[in-house]
Amino acid sequence: MSFMDQIPGGGNYPKLPVECLPNFPIQPSLTFRGRNDSHKLKNFISEIMLNMSMISWPNDASRIVYCRRHLLNPAAQWANDFVQEQGILEITFDTFIQGLYQHFYKPPDINKIFNAITQLSEAKLGIERLNQRFRKIWDRMPPDFMTEKAAIMTYTRLLTKETYNIVRMHKPETLKDAMEEAYQTTALTERFFPGFELDADGDTIIGATTHLQEEYDSDYDSEDNLTQNGYVHTVRTRRSYNKPMSNHRNRRNNNPSREECIKNRLCFYCKKEGHRLNECRARKAVLTDLELESKDQQTPFIKTLPIVHYIAIPEMDNTAEKTIKIQNTKVKTLFDSGSPTSFIRRDIVELLKYEIYETPPLRFRGFVATKSAVTSEAVTIDLKINDLHITLAAYILDNMDYQLLIGNPILRRYPKILHTVLNTRESPDSLKPKTYRSETVNNVRTYSAGNRGNPRNIKLSFAPTILEATDPKSAGNRGDSRTKTLSLATTTPAAIDPLTTLDNPGSTQSTFAQFPIPEEASILEEDGKYSNVVSTIQSVEPNATDHSNKDTFCTLPVWLQQKYREIIRNDLPPRPADINNIPVKHDIEIKPGARLPRLQPYHVTEKNEQEINKIVQKLLDNKFIVPSKSPCSSPVVLVPKKDGTFRLCVDYRTLNKATISDPFPLPRIDNLLSRIGNAQIFTTLDLHSGYHQIPMEPKDRYKTAFVTPSGKYEYTVMPFGLVNAPSTFARYMADTFRDLRFVNVYLDDILIFSESPEEHWKHLDTVLERLKNENLIVKKKKCKFASEETEFLGYSIGIQKIAPLQHKCAAIRDFPTPKTVKQAQRFLGMINYYRRFIPNCSKIAQPIQLFICDKSQWTEKQDKAIDKLKDALCNSPVLVPFNNKANYRLTTDASKDGIGAVLEEVDNKNKLVGVVGYFSKSLESAQKNYPAGELELLGIIKALHHFRYMLHGKHFTLRTDHISLLSLQNKNEPARRVQRWLDDLATYDFTLEYLAGPKNVVADAISRAVYTITPETSRPIDTESWKSYYKSDPLCSAVLIHMKELTQHNVTPEDMSAFRSYQKKLELSETFRKNYSLEDEMIYYQDRLVVPIKQQNAVMRLYHDHTLFGGHFGVTVTLAKISPIYYWPKLQHSIIQYIRTCVQCQLIKSHRPRLHGLLQPLPIAEGRWLDISMDFVTGLPPTSNNLNMILVVVDRFSKRAHFIATRKTLDATQLIDLLFRYIFSYHGFPRTITSDRDVRMTADKYQELTKRLGIKSTMSSANHPQTDGQSERTIQTLNRLLRAYASTNIQNWHVYLPQIEFVYNSTPTRTLGKSPFEIDLGYLPNTPAIKSDDEVNARSFTAVELAKHLKALTIQTKEQLEHAQIEMETNNNQRRKPLLLNIGDHVLVHRDAYFKKGAYMKVQQIYVGPFRVVKKINDNAYELDLNSHKKKHRVINVQFLKKFVYRPDAYPKNKPISSTERIKRAHEVTALIGIDTTHKTYLCHMQDVDPTLSVEYSEAEFCQIPERTRRSILANFRQLYETQDNPEREEDVVSQNEICQYDNTSP
């Protein structure tokens, strides 16, 4: 079939001779401009094909020319270009049309189409214009997007209530039929009841003469009328305006069209001259012309329909409570005339065993739900209220205060309920429905009203409010004649069914487009339940989806709902006939010699027997069981459920003992959780009675026979209670989903997880498709679709979150204290399920374990363990799921009490992202005797075994605070168990990282005295003494003077302005004045004590600095402590200033962010080997000739590097020798050398030589290796290459150094895009792997050519370096800010910048100082007045500096001057900041003395300091200030163990 044959209009038509071509001129209306409108393009092609098919064309070229004449720009321009490229004689007409279609076709925008539909309504457009526009828009819909029934439902939502109700009663089967019925209904209404229309709310009928305005419709075009926001531009008309349909099948062909009527001034109704429509006599004689014409036959539109009239219920919300009986069960009922439908609680439905049927989703909010919620289940209820029998349908809710709520539709249908329950004043007779019957005699229709069978003639002067029709199908099914009514004048068409829409079907604010439209949507289902309309009770914002309700199926895409509605349901259908086709069947193998059960039924009560019979009958109906003649029999028992119903269980214990076990391991829950990774959206599925969906092996069915008091039955499906049933089911589910990595299956619980909604729909489709193929049914109400958080196997799983369920934690928290071993075991069993959330769980639970093992009595220790476990679980951190692409760090620890570990996820900067899991284990008695090294290794091995499913085969970091691993690996003959551990350890890929530990003997941090400057320890405040300060305080004195308690004041001149301001406020403002009061001679502001100015610092010192009341917290906490008790003006401002100038806070609190100083890179190198940088790589294992260090020298221009093997004993003289031999002799003398402050570079010999050679030596600031970033980056690459090359021969790493240097210099750099060799030499040296061509031939250049080539490379390289430097500055300086200091300023220095890390750093101050700035090096580096004993340089980068904020009034004491005063105040020494070994003096800081000042103590005076304080400050001084012994930086070390971990890593 050709492309043209697939387009409407492309079929075969009778051919005419080509001479007829002049008779087919170009049609201006048949044009295509090239808009991306698929509907218009298809119409254009169809019309063109239709016209051309009627002519005999000589060739394809003439057909192309004819089609081209109907194209306008830009389509015409495309056609010209296409024909010129292809050649008009070379292409076929089919190719031309196909090209046009592919170029301009655009798939329709479904959202835009639906938005356009929502703007249509019969009330605005009239029925004909509605039909025309709806059809035009609907034709743009993809053919398979929606079923015919869904299209009908969508269309009927646009009709007025009158038309809507009548159309759905006729059950149209196609959209065309629905539109036809709507047109006929509207036409009939106009002819029956001229001059009447509904008012705005549709509740009453008012008389009005309709004047039809002569208005025209604009031709509807998708691009012109579908705007970006989806609104449709239309011409406004009266809601009763209906343009005649000239081509309607019930209209005569000779009838003039509407345009002709307008042109010739004809009546729209009778088509005659001389009058208008509202004056037409023929139209007024409506009762004499009731039959509508039809082409085929004359059919009356409405047969005899009884018309029922109800007395209007007052428009008020009447409510009443009443207890009614349903099936002898008392039900608490609310009669509410304000509710638009009826509801019933789920527990009553289950108790009364009502049959539940599905409905489209109903969204509601109000009395029955505080938030928007959705339900899609309903039941039919038969009620009897006094002598009134009622049948109603009610939606099912999970939670509601009342068990049943009967709403307005039922109360309007049965007014007698109002008289009985709500006590209305109408008499019972007046509340009886009045029935009107219509009869047609001699083509004249008359109406009669019937009351108790006595008809009387009446004159009908208004439109009927209710139409009532008998449903014969319902009557046949239920044995009675159920009446279905249709309301035309009420807001809710409740007479058809209470489960209907509340909003106006014709309203433009309809919300149907916000909900998925089900495939099975229909106007009226066969059982009489109208359930196709998506119902709302209150309007909901678009896309406002509430996921709190259990029914989330409606949130899925439409195509998923349509595809899988049959398998996602709340009821379990009968056993399908092809269930035996399932590849898995359950069999029962009996042990040899075992006897099958032959047991009698248990005794049951009559009530229980009835329950058993009901359940058995339901199983029989579903074909799950059949009557049996088996020789076996097992008894049954009834197990009560939480909702009061029962579950039938078969006692298969005897059968299970005789069955051969078939164990199949269930998946580990922690393994399942580890697969979630970075999932963002989740769905949980629960199979509906999963066991009952697997058939029994026919030969083994008789073994499942069970006996009840009324008979014997056997299962055709797998029953619950069989010993091997879980294995069969688990094996079946594992085989079904084994290859899907996005699915976790645990028996009948299924979790689907994805990283995006689009991916999730595909995953969900895959899983549901397999379930559908296996005939497995999913229980809808237990599923949760497409949510960001869900519950699975007792865990709450969300985005980057795994947490225990709160109600499970609450159950553990409320668990009573165990008194017996059994209770203790039960408690630990609950704890063990969540032990992954509890750090050191085994250690905490050890006292309970001792009690269970009868090694201890229950004491206070066990009580504390219980409380600790409960607190740890309830306050447990939220774990993050394992992500195979992330970086992980495992930290282990071991002690005599047990071993523990924590697995953490870290980012690329080694910062913590979250905890993945905890592990802990108690030690056995023998393990407690292991040496410390083996015990630490045991902890590592156990932790690796526990997290093996995550870490094996993945690189990670292993942290431990013990060097056991290295020492044990170096043993010649380790113990056998250690050897096994080391072999096991070798199967993992990890980097070993040792936690920093103490290397010097220091005092215990806990026993150390405070060594920083702190204000005097505050004493409790004596508020009585404040009275003496009132006179000098401006506020207090003003208040006392106003209260006549004070006549004179002592306010200082500085405070006089504030004093006068307070006086003025007290005189003029009542609000200000009433806040102050005097009690016991103390001034209060409201209920807070007013603090004088001179006592404000004392209050802040107490609540900020005091060891009991303070704690040096921040502004918020300190304000919260002070403000409820004390008051003074600008209280918050005072607290902010006080804390900002607190010395202790400045020293101990981390400064965030520490991004001071803008990035200032080194100047760009001018040429090759003019500017070089160098550094050392240390920590290498010694080689056979004792080489254990590498000198790295890098040309900052070409990035070429030399790696020179040497020894750590290298001194300055030997360093100079290496530079001459390997650098200067090959490349000449550089202008600058950049390095760190290594002792070899700071040596006098090195400095003297570089000075004589004219080399400028630039060094980094203290502890800031980023200054020499070039060397640091090169060393990182060198370390990686060493691990790759020397992994199998670590003792001879120096052998591989030349190869590593060649590989490094041959590799292009990211900055320059070329290799260092190419930049330096002008060519890439030849290698065996490549042929020598291109730039390699540069070696054969002439001298002039080579010079030109190198010069070009130099210019290009400088430009690239400058560009890279600008980009680096731009990227790094975005989050930085400059810190500008002046000479003489005091600053605090971060401990990481200058001082050595030691033990107990958590209790050490973060900043030290203050120190004075003595010289500015540049904007990023300053020289400080550091102590003269310090050998390190005094230049510090601003990254580690913080301005010291000075508070003069915080230091009330002066420093001691005389020796006697120093000795007397020796106990006030708080810190040692320097030692002058020449003069044997000690520089100290003292309490309450300005910290910028130091006190010099002689050696004899220093010995007078209390011993405890002296030892403490000396220990702190050694730890923070002394020079490090090892000049090498630890981060450059490549340890033996690190190299071993990279045996499989390529460079």
UniProtKB/Swiss-Prot annotation:
Major localization class:
cytoplasm
Q: Which Pfam families match?
A: Integrase_H2C2, Peptidase_A2B, RT_RNaseH_2, rve, RVT_1, SH3_Tf2-1, Ty3_capsid
Q: Which Gene3D superfamilies match?
A: 1.10.340.70, 3.30.70.270, Acid Proteases, HIV Type 1 Reverse Transcriptase, subunit A, domain 1, Ribonuclease H-like superfamily/Ribonuclease H
Q: Return the annotated region ranges for Integrase-type zinc finger-like.
A: 1106-1145
Positions bearing the site annotation: Cleavage: 207-208, 233-234, 309-310, 442-443, 535-536, 1011-1012, 1037-1038
Give the ZnF (CCHC-type) ranges. Answer: 265-282
Query: So where's the catalytic machinery, residue-wise?
Result: 336
Q: What is its subcellular localisation?
A: Cytoplasm; Nucleus
The UniProt record lists the EC number as 3.4.23.-, 2.7.7.49, 2.7.7.7, 3.1.26.4
Q: Where is the RNase H Ty3/gyspy-type domain?
A: 893-1011
Q: Where does Mg(2+) 2 bind?
A: 893, 936, 961
Which residues pair up as cystines?
none
State where Mg(2+) 3 binds: 1175, 1236
The UniProt GO MF terms for this protein read: aspartic-type endopeptidase activity; ATP binding; DNA binding; DNA-directed DNA polymerase activity; RNA binding; RNA-directed DNA polymerase activity; RNA-DNA hybrid ribonuclease activity; zinc ion binding
Q: Where is the Integrase catalytic domain?
A: 1159-1324
Record: residues binding Mg(2+) 1: 686, 748-749
Q: Which keywords annotate this record?
A: Acetylation, Aspartyl protease, ATP-binding, Cytoplasm, DNA integration, DNA recombination, DNA-binding, DNA-directed DNA polymerase, Endonuclease, Hydrolase, Magnesium, Metal-binding, Multifunctional enzyme, Nuclease, Nucleotide-binding, Nucleotidyltransferase, Nucleus, Protease, RNA-binding, RNA-directed DNA polymerase, Transferase, Transposable element, Viral release from host cell, Virion maturation, Zinc, Zinc-finger
GO BP of this protein: DNA integration; DNA recombination; proteolysis; viral translational frameshifting
CDD domains tied to this protein? retropepsin_like (cd00303), RNase_HI_RT_Ty3 (cd09274), RT_LTR (cd01647)
Q: What else is known?
A: Retrotransposons are mobile genetic entities that are able to replicate via an RNA intermediate and a reverse transcription step. In contrast to retroviruses, retrotransposons are non-infectious, lack an envelope and remain intracellular. Ty3 retrotransposons belong to the gypsy-like elements (metaviridae).
Q: What is this protein called?
A: Transposon Ty3-G Gag-Pol polyprotein
Q: Which organism is it from?
A: Saccharomyces cerevisiae (strain ATCC 204508 / S288c)
